Amino acid sequence: MKISHCRLLKKIQLRLLEFFVLEVTARSAADILGIQPNSAALFYRKIREVTAYHLEQESHEIFDGVVELDESYFGGVRKGKPGRGAAGKVAVFGILKRGGKVYTKVVGDTKSETLMPLITRKIAPDSIVYTDCYRSYNALDVSHFYHERINHSTLFAQGKNHINGIENFWNQAKRVLRKYNGILKESFPLFLKECEFRFNYGTPKQQLKILKNWTQI
């Protein structure tokens, strides 16, 4: 998949790609380049679509060794009692290979029967899996993994016993998404994959090189 059927000049496309990597909003990029905001927004969407496509192509990669699992919630207005989840929020499940990449998936809920198929499909048997004490991870105790739990009420990190990596990703993703001041729910998976890409592919220079290749600009 690449960016095609775009009426913008190639030099404008390249500048938009550079601005995207630098986290310049589409509106600001449009102002700088003297183009219509809708044109910049549409091009940014095309970048996200290409990015999501290529990340999906890579999603068959199996994580092994030490892996961290966690779930988080994005958007919406928190209602009711505080705790796991909230009305109007989007649930996201994350799997991080410690020292490596993160994989994310929007999920309808965070029940064990929803998460376990994702876990067994993505993580190699005999891997060491770190989670918090959420009950949905209880099934890992009788799985083909070595399961270690983190009790946040008593400690945050102790040596290798932590899930700081995946929690760092959540913080980074929410920082990136906060500047958009609201994202349509149907578009959220594309923005999530943008965050996954930024986390997995190093410096802006590296990201630009990869996106030039993926988009064929």
Would you name each region that the model predicts?
Residues 1-217:
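Residue-level recognition of single "structural anchor" positions
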